[in-house]
A protein has these predicted regions:
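Short, aromatic/basic amphipathic alpha-helical patches
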Residues: 48-55, 169-175, 312-318
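Non-catalytic alpha-helical coupling and interface elements of nucleotide-dependent molecular machines
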Residues: 32, 85, 109-113, 126, ...
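Nucleotide-state-sensitive switch-loop elements of NTP-binding domains
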Residues: 2-9, 14, 18-146
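A short acidic, often aromatic-flanked loop/helix-cap motif at beta-alpha or helix-coil junctions
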Residues: 65-68, 189-194, 334-339
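P-loop NTP-binding site
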Residues: 1-8, 13-14, 18, 203-345
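Short acidic, S/G/P-rich loop/turn micro-motifs used as interaction or catalytic elements
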Residues: 96-97, 129-131, 163-164, 304-307
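Canonical P-loop GTPase G-domain recognition
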Residues: 143, 147-157, 161-223
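A structural preference for short, hydrophobic beta-strand core positions in alpha/beta folds
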Residues: 36, 183-186, 327-329
Length: 345
C-alpha cells in the first residue's frame, strides 16, 4: 500500500504541532508507521523538538515555506519514506503560509504520481484567533492570510473546543466563510474528535483541489508584518518550572501571533506557549524525569514588531532571568517575499 501524505495547515498558534503529535500517537496504536515533516522560515524549531521527543521520525524544512522550498520538502519526504516505510506522512507548513493546494499539494501529486496518496488538506483553527480576526484586531494583511487559509481548506478543524465556552459561535463563522469544507470539532490537547477526523481524511479521495485567487503583494505584506525570532539559550541553576512563564512574561511586546518555548533539563521537558487571543503562557510537561542544574531553552517568537525590537526584547528577558543565560544561536528577521517553486492553478 502506498503511503498517505496528510498536510495540516493553520495559522500560527492554532495547535498544529500538538495535533500532529496526538495523531501520530493514535496512528501508532493502530499499528501504523508515521513520520513527520516540519517547516519554518529558519532552523531551531520547537515543533521539530516536540515531535522527535515523542519518538516519531522527523525531518525539518528550514529557511522557507514548503512552497518556496518545494524541492527540499519533496526530497525530505522521499528520504523519510525510503528510510522508514511509513503508512502516513504528516506535514506541517509554516503557520503564515497560504496557497498550499496550488503550490504544494497539486505539484506533489504530479511529481509523486501513483507512489503517494495526497489526503484532503486540513486547516486547524483556534476560536480565539478567529474572533480576533473577525473583530479587526490584527494587521489587515495578516488577516488576509488567515482568511485565505480557511478558504482553501478541504477540512476545517475547530480546535481547543475543550477550552471554548461556546464552540457553536466560531463554528457558525466558519460555516459562513467556508460552506464547502468539512468541519470537525476537536481538541488536540485531549484527543477529542481526532480519531474521527483521521478516519475521515485517511479514507477520503485525494484533496487539494480548491482553487483560490491570491494577491501575493498582500500575502508578502502580511508575513512581513511579523517579526520572527528563533533562539537557543543555555541556562544554569534555575527553578525550571517557573522559568518559561517568567521568560515569556518578560518579553513585554504586544501583537503576539505565537510565542513558544521549550526547556530541556536532564529528563525534564517543558513547553509553554502564548498565542493570539490567549496571551497568558500555557505550560505543560512533555517528560517528567529528574532535571539537572543545566537547561537548554529554544525560543520561537512571531510577534508584530520590527525584528531588531523583537531581538532586544528576547535578549533582555533572558538577562532578566539571572541564570547566566548564554545565547548559543539567535536569528531575528522578517520573512522574504514568497516565491513558489511551482503553482498549478
Amino acid at each position: 500500500m502506498i503511503p498517505t501524505l496528510l498536510i495540516v495547515g493553520g495559522f500560527l498558534g492554532s495547535g498544529k504541532t500538538t495535533l500532529l503529535a496526538k495523531a501520530a500517537a493514535m496512528l501508532a496504536k493502530r499499528g501504523k508507521r508515521v513520520v513527520v515533516v516540519t517547516n519554518d522560515q529558519a532552523p531551531g524549531l520547537v515543533d521539530t523538538a516536540i515531535i522527535e521527543l515523542a519518538g516519531v521520525p522527523a525531518a525539518e524544512v528550514a529557511g522557507a515555506c514548503f512552497c518556496c522550498a518545494f524541492d527540499d520538502f519533496a526530497a525530505k519526504t522521499r528520504q523519510l519514506i525510503a528510510r522508514h516505510q511509513p503508512d502516513v506522512v504528516l506535514a506541517e507548513p509554516v503557520g503564515s503560509c497560504v496557497d498550499i493546494a496550488a503550490t504544494v499539494l497539486r505539484p506533489l501529486a504530479v511529481e509523486a504520481g501513483s507512489t503517494l496518496h495526497v489526503a484532503p488538506f486540513s486547516v486547524v483553527v483556534d476560536p480565539a484567533a478567529l474572533r480576533e480576526v473577525e473583530a479587526g484586531a490584527i494587521d489587515p494583511a495578516t488577516a488576509y492570510i488567515y482568511r485565505l487559509q480557511l478558504r482553501e481548506a478541504d477540512v476545517l478543524l475547530l480546535n481547543k473546543c475543550d477550552a471554548e465556552p461556546d464552540p457553536a459561535l466560531p463554528e457558525a463563522i466558519l460555516s459562513a466563510h467556508c460552506p464547502s469544507a468539512a468541519l470537525f470539532r476537536i481538541s488536540a490537547a485531549t484527543g477529542d474528535g481526532v480519531e474521527g477526523w483521521l478516519d475521515a481524511v485517511l479514507a477520503a479521495a485525494p484533496g487539494g483541489g480548491k482553487r483560490i485567487e491570491v494577491d501575493y503583494d498582500t500575502y508578502a505584506a502580511g508575513e512581513a508584518a511579523l517579526g520572527w525570532l528563533n533562539a537557543t539559550v543555555d541556562l544554569h541553576g534555575g527553578d525550571w518550572e517557573s522559568v518559561l512563564p517568567r521568560l515569556m512574561q518578560s518579553i513585554d511586546l504586544r501583537g503576539i501571533a505565537h510565542l513558544k518555548c521549550l526547556l530541556k533539563s536532564g529528563g525534564l521537558v517543558l513547553v509553554a506557549n502564548s498565542v493570539t487571543g490567549r496571551p497568558e503562557p500555557h505550560l505543560r510537561r512533555l517528560a517528567s524525569v529528574a532535571s539537572t542544574l543545566d537547561a537548554r531553552v529554544i525560543v520561537n517568537a512571531r510577534i508584530a514588531c520590527p525584528p531588531d525590537e523583537l531581538r532586544q526584547a528576547v535578549e533582555g528577558a533572558i538577562a532578566t532571568l539571572g541564570l547566566g543565560g548564554q545565547v548559543k544561536g539567535i536569528r531575528a528577521f522578517s520573512p522574504s517575499r514568497p516565491v513558489p517553486r511551482h503553482r498549478l492553478g
